[in-house]
């Protein structure tokens, strides 16, 4: 089965006032759908058409050269957004506890230090891109950023939290005020989902 746009786990207006309904609708139904359509078009008729997008990104070097750029741009866009929708919730916010909370304390210097590092990654990403909390192959937490639709999967890391800092993610509400958008994101992070992804990455 070709790649498909995943349904949002909440209504387009569910993250108001932090992320507005119109942005969510355009971002999901137009931008993400375009990545899915372009990925399917690029892979049509190839042995890779039904491979999970995460596998394609992890094995990029093994793909035919003509497929690599479409997979990075559109497969990355599909994978990144598919994660992004699920790590937000109208019941989000607060801070992580359990194993993830302890790991952030021990490896990243505590929750406030994590927020500082993650905010810096999002703020200093020039142009379009993402900020990430990832798990390395050694099982360590890493705050990183990537340009355009590049995914941490391409470097062997497993993203468990991502923030889209492309202008289409925030411009309708925040215009050029990226710092406000980043601050608002902390109010909708679903730390239970991030913790689930953390446990899965370590398994």
Curated annotation (Swiss-Prot):
Taxonomic lineage from the root: Bacteria, Pseudomonadati, Pseudomonadota, Gammaproteobacteria, Pseudomonadales
Regulation: induction: By growth in a high-phosphate succinate medium; more highly expressed in mucoid than non-mucoid cells in both Y and LTG mdia (at protein level). Part of the fumC-PA4469-sodA operon which is repressed by iron.
Origin species: Pseudomonas aeruginosa (strain ATCC 15692 / DSM 22644 / CIP 104116 / JCM 14847 / LMG 12228 / 1C / PRS 101 / PAO1)
Protein name: Superoxide dismutase [Mn]
One Gene Ontology cellular component annotation held by this UniProt entry: cytoplasm
PROSITE patterns: SOD_MN (PS00088)
Keywords for this protein: Manganese, Metal-binding, Oxidoreductase
Main function: Destroys superoxide anion radicals which are normally produced within the cells and which are toxic to biological systems. Partially complements double sodA-sodB deletions in E.coli.
Top-level taxonomic group: Bacteria
Cofactor: Mn(2+)
EC number: 1.15.1.1
Binding site for Mn(2+): 27, 81, 164, 168
Subunit structure: Homodimer.
PANTHER family named among the record's database cross-references: 37S RIBOSOMAL PROTEIN S26, MITOCHONDRIAL (PTHR43595), SMALL RIBOSOMAL SUBUNIT PROTEIN MS42 (PTHR43595:SF2)
Similarity comment text for this entry: Belongs to the iron/manganese superoxide dismutase family.
Gene that encodes it: sodA
A Pfam family of this chain: Sod_Fe_C
Cofactor annotation comment: Binds 1 Mn(2+) ion per subunit.
Reaction(s) the record says it catalyses: 2 superoxide + 2 H(+) = H2O2 + O2
GO BP annotations, alphabetical order: removal of superoxide radicals
């Amino acid at each position: 089965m070709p790649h498909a746009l995943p349904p949002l786990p909440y209504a387009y207006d569910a993250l108001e006032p932090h992320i507005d309904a119109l942005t969510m609708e355009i971002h999901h139904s137009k931008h993400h759908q375009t990545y899915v359509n372009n990925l399917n078009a690029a892979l049509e008729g190839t042995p890779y058409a039904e491979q999970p997008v995460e596998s394609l990104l992890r094995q990029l070097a093994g793909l035919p050269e003509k497929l690599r750029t479409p997979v990075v741009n559109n497969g990355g866009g599909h994978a990144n957004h598919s994660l992004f929708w699920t790590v937000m919730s109208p019941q989000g916010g607060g801070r992580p506890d359990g194993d993830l909370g302890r790991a952030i304390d021990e490896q990243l210097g505590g929750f406030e230090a994590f927020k500082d590092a993650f905010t810096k990654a999002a703020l200093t990403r020039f142009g379009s891109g993402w900020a990430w909390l990832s798990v390395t192959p050694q099982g360590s937490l890493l705050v990183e950023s990537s340009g355009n639709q590049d995914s941490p999967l391409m470097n062997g890391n497993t993203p468990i939290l991502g923030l889209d800092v492309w202008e289409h993610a925030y411009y309708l509400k925040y215009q050029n005020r990226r710092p406000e958008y980043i601050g608002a994101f902390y109010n909708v992070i679903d730390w239970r989902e991030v913790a689930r992804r953390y446990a899965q990455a370590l398994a």
